[in-house]
Amino acid sequence: MARSAFTWELGQGLGHLVRYLPLARTLVERDDDVWCLVKNVGQAERVFSGLPVRIEQIEPGSTPRAQQLRTLNSYPGILRNSGVYSDALEKQIAAWIGMFCQIDPGLLVIDHSPMAMLANRISKIPSIVSGTGFTVPP
């Protein structure tokens, strides 16, 4: 049985999860083991209701409030406020790598998850990065 893991780290709307639904259904129909590593378990449970998908909470990073940008007008600003420039970056990457080791997926499907993408540069799990031009950094 193949194992896949979907990730969602940043952003607020259900669109980050809904786009996964057709692929998750197909994988489940193939009898694959499907995981979702998400920032909001409640939203994931609503979207994947009725599917045998394992849902795990991840803790998105953040920069201490005093160091955050007040106005966000670019992707680097979002990354800054999400902990990329904080002392906790190494812990965030280690947490993702730990989750990948625990689950051992054969495929990652990544949506608006920059720390997961960075951690996967180390883990080297085959991956698909999905999203809009804004949520997929170069």
Where would I find each of the regions flagged by the language model?
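A short, glycine/small-residue-rich beta-strand->loop->alpha-helix junction that serves as a flexible
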Residues: W8-L21
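Hydrophobic/aromatic ligand-binding patch that stacks against planar heteroaromatic rings
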Residues: T26, L118-A119
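Active-site-proximal region of nucleotide-activated glycan assembly enzymes
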Residues: S123-P138
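Conserved nucleotide-sugar phosphate-binding/catalytic loop shared by glycosyltransferases and other
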Residues: F6, E29-R30, V34-D87
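Histidine-centered beta-alpha loop that forms part of the nucleotide-sugar donor binding/catalytic region
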Residues: E9, S113, G131-F134
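Extreme N-terminal starter segment of soluble prokaryotic enzymes
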Residues: M1-A5
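Conserved nucleotide-sugar donor-binding subdomain of glycosyltransferases
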Residues: L72-L107, S113-M115
